[in-house]
Each structure stands twice: as structure tokens, then as C-alpha cells.
């Protein structure tokens, strides 16, 4: 077994205090997202989306956040993907934003709700054309005999859609994750990290400090 126990560092970029927290967690999330973007972090919108299968086995993957507001967090995916199939059976999911250079993490528990075709199309039309074509090509999570199969399909579809707009695939969609709880983690000195969790109680957010 490889021993990694000596890899550590102190966290000293700042603290998080109850008096500084807004009542709405999405306001704090918006601030932290802005600061992550201003710091020019690589992929600040990247989040880990966790789902479970029918046996309770968890699965995780990195997905890009595309929109957020007071209602929740939006991402898009192939509806035939493993994540979409698992959401169809159990829409309870978790999201995790790892902003390591800022010594911050945000963890979200919530329920995924399918977006309307109108909402999906609105976003789909903003994607670069090659990305739109790629959505037609990949049967996400299916097995491939070789990469050349995928590339061949891509160039075939690229020729097919050379003129005009690329239509929205019926098997491509998106989700709004409505949060039930949001935890904010700020690294602290001597491993005394600051953790605050917002928990939704009907229409009110309850704020609690958690031990690190």
C-alpha cells in the first residue's frame, strides 16, 4: 500500500463566521462562485454529481453547472446516460464543488427535476455546433469497440448537419436540482475548519455550524 500520510498543508486563506452569512444560501453560493471565477480557477463550474442505482451503489461524475438561481442548480446530459437512468429511478442526488485553491467546498443535497423541452432547447442552441453534433453521436455510457467508431459517427453526423441548425436530440435533456441542504466549508488553521449547513424547513433556511 502506498503511504500518503505525510502529504498535508495548513489552510490559512480565511474564515467563515455566522455573522457574515446571508439568510439565503444561494446568495453565498453566488458570491463564492464569483470569487472562484475571479480567481481564474480551472473549471470553476465543475461539480461532482452523485447518484445511486437500484442496489444503493453510489456513482459519481464531474458535470458542468450551467445555471443557478434561488430555485437550484441546472445541468444538462444525455437522457440515456447512467446518471439520467438512475435519476429516473431515484431523483435524490448530491452535488459537490471543490474549489481547492480557495480552500473551499460546497456540498448540496437535493432532488433532480427534469427541465422542459423549451428550457433544454434554449440552452442547446447556445452550444457550439460541434458540441451540438456530439450530442447526437454519443450513446452515453454504452460500450464502444474503439474510439474510431465514435469519431466516424461524428463526421457522419457533421456532414448530415452541414447546412442549417442542428436539431435537439429527443434523448438529450437537463435537470434542475432543488436543494434541501447546502453546506459551505472553509479551510481553517490547525484543521479547525469552518462548516455551516443551511437546511430547508418548509420555506425557511435554518443555519447551523458543524464541527470540522
Curated annotation (Swiss-Prot):
It catalyses: pyridoxamine 5'-phosphate + O2 + H2O = pyridoxal 5'-phosphate + H2O2 + NH4(+); pyridoxine 5'-phosphate + O2 = pyridoxal 5'-phosphate + H2O2. One of its GO terms (biological process) is pyridoxine biosynthetic process. Pfam families: PNP_phzG_C, PNPOx_N. Transmembrane segments: none annotated. Binds 1 FMN per subunit. Gene3D superfamilies: Electron Transport, Fmn-binding Protein, Chain A. Pathway: Cofactor metabolism; pyridoxal 5'-phosphate salvage; pyridoxal 5'-phosphate from pyridoxamine 5'-phosphate: step 1/1; Cofactor metabolism; pyridoxal 5'-phosphate salvage; pyridoxal 5'-phosphate from pyridoxine 5'-phosphate: step 1/1. Keywords: Flavoprotein, FMN, Oxidoreductase, Pyridoxine biosynthesis. GO terms for molecular function: FMN binding; pyridoxamine phosphate oxidase activity. Disulfide bonds: none annotated. Its cofactor is FMN. Its EC number is 1.4.3.5. FMN binds at residues 61-66, 76-77, 82-83, 105, 140-141, 185, 195. Substrate binds at residues 8-11, 66, 123, 127, 131, 191-193. Belongs to the pyridoxamine 5'-phosphate oxidase family. NCBIfam families: pdxH, PRK05679.1. Catalyzes the oxidation of either pyridoxine 5'-phosphate (PNP) or pyridoxamine 5'-phosphate (PMP) into pyridoxal 5'-phosphate (PLP). Homodimer. This is Pyridoxine/pyridoxamine 5'-phosphate oxidase. The gene is pdxH.
